[in-house]
């Protein structure tokens, strides 16, 4: 038999409702940024029970951080599952205030070769990432070169 904890369902619904309302308010007020990233090399994925953490090279000195939840509401999860995050161009809208990422698209040709996907225990992943990257939020740019971020995390794990 399959049982549902009603309290957990209510809490999840409340959280998603609050986030949705914050995102709608930010959209109505016009507070958001359109982002675009042209990938030249494969992003790195750290897969965990609740989703996937993604690092991508943004520039020579910056790394893009995504924390993609395994949720139906986040289009990035389906793109990841279908292998479409290996496309050359990413575009998204990040709303101010709520920090919610919406309207994410991955376009263009696929990057050549294979990317790197690691499966990590969530506590292990978060401890290492927060230590190395300074507690980034979803969609943040980190002041660290991509290769340095990857190698440092891998060394810590």
Please identify what each model-predicted range represents.
Residues 155:
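Short, surface-exposed polybasic-aromatic patches that bind anionic ligands, especially phosphate groups
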Residues 31-148:
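Structured extramembrane domains adjacent to transmembrane segments
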Residues 1-54:
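N-terminal topogenic membrane-targeting module
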